[in-house]
Amino acid sequence: MHVVFFVCALTSIAAVVLICLFLFANGIPAMKEIGLLNFLTGAKWKPGNDIYGILPMILDSIYITAGAVVIGVPIGLLTAIFMAFYCPKKLYGLLKPCTELLAGIPSIVYGFFGMVIIVPCIRTVAALFGADVSGSSILAASILLGIMILPTIIGVSEAALRAVPSAYYEGAVAMGARHERAIFTVMLPAAKSGVLAGIVLGIGRAIGETMAVIMVAGNQPRLTGNMLKGIRTMPANIVLEMGYATGLHREALIATGVVLFVFILIINLTFSVLKRRKQA
């Protein structure tokens, strides 16, 4: 039986290696031809003129990921705390399946919800303040991604909080701490590794999300810090143009995938380092 387990593990490793080989073998030549600095810091993406700069899409990906974290992390963490320590059993029986259902909803359905509900709401509210915007924007994508990462953060954080020995809570209460104080000063810090894991997983999903973002972000590759302006992320750029790209254009899109892969790798390595430091 151990041979079967070994083969399964080897298959997983082989899949990762093959993906890395494909990305770097096809992406690095494009970076060399375009110029790494020009590729990473170029402000214009015009395949028709052989101009390939992905800085706008890098920044746009960071903007909507940061926005999703600002929206999703507080809500997700507080919901996890409520479900672990405050929620009545009957309400928990309803709330838990709902959060699990959120995780199973396809991205395209989230995108449709954002396009029909979130985008018009932003357009309407902006109009009240005299702003003429389409609604497809950084803000719309951030709100939608904030909702999409909730089940990941809630599920992992709740499991981490429930894994903390009850003796921690009982000891804090015995020393005179109130219920809220025992939770936020004892239980939550004890579960910080698991909570951080949930946040990192949520960030990973946000930065790599494609279909939902395409439907609400506006898909305009440009440099902007305006939350009400349309943007294009790295994954969206790959999906929108890969179908007809050839030659250097295709290789530049694969190189964009390399940059996205490195982003995810940095996030995971950062989490690993932080986890080791906290365990030391």
Question: Residues of each region from the PLM?
Answer:
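Transmembrane alpha-helix signature in integral membrane proteins
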Residues: I54-F82
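Interhelical loop and adjacent transmembrane-helix boundary motif
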Residues: V213-F261
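C-terminal transmembrane helix and the adjacent membrane-cytosol boundary/short C-terminal tail
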Residues: E158-R162, S166, V173, G243-A280
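Transmembrane alpha-helices
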Residues: P97, L101, V156-S157, L161, ...
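Interfacial/capping segments of alpha-helical transmembrane domains
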Residues: V17-T41, L228
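Membrane-interfacial helix termini and adjacent extracytoplasmic/periplasmic loops
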Residues: E33-Y52, G111-I147, G218
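Glycine/proline-centered hinge or cleavage motifs at structural transition points of membrane proteins
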Residues: P106, M175-G176, P189
